[in-house]
Curated annotation (Swiss-Prot):
Localization in the cell: Secreted
UniProt key word Disulfide bond: yes
Organism, scientific name: Phoneutria nigriventer (Brazilian armed spider)
Disulfide pattern: 8-19, 13-28, 18-51, 38-59, 53-65
Superkingdom of origin organism: Eukaryota
Function: Non-toxic to mice and insects.
GO CC annotations, alphabetized: extracellular region
Residue numbers carrying Pyrrolidone carboxylic acid: 1
The protein's name in its UniProt record: U19-ctenitoxin-Pn1a
UniProt keyword terms in alphabetical order: Disulfide bond, Pyrrolidone carboxylic acid, Secreted
Distribution of this protein across tissues and organs: Expressed by the venom gland.
Length: 68
């Protein structure tokens, strides 16, 4: 279980969340909604500035979620 103020990994975050942030400021955040900033899923499952989109949405080239 992730504790606010501590660094996380995706395994620490709950369902519908990812671990995002820089090296020293990682935190659990909800998956991105329509029109919200996002980061595309990657093979390392690491995110620096946002989570992937919620199901049914895709992260566009401009890094915002839109309906598929």
């Amino acid at each position: 279980q992730w504790i606010p103020g501590q660094s996380c990994t995706n395994a620490d975050c709950g369902e519908g969340q990812c671990c995002t942030g820089g090296s020293y400021n990682r935190h659990c955040q909800s998956l991105s909604d329509d029109g919200k900033p996002c980061q595309r899923p990657n093979k390392y499952d690491e995110y620096k500035f946002g989570c992937p989109c919620k199901e049914g949405l895709m992260c566009q080239v401009i890094n915002y979620c839109q309906k598929k």
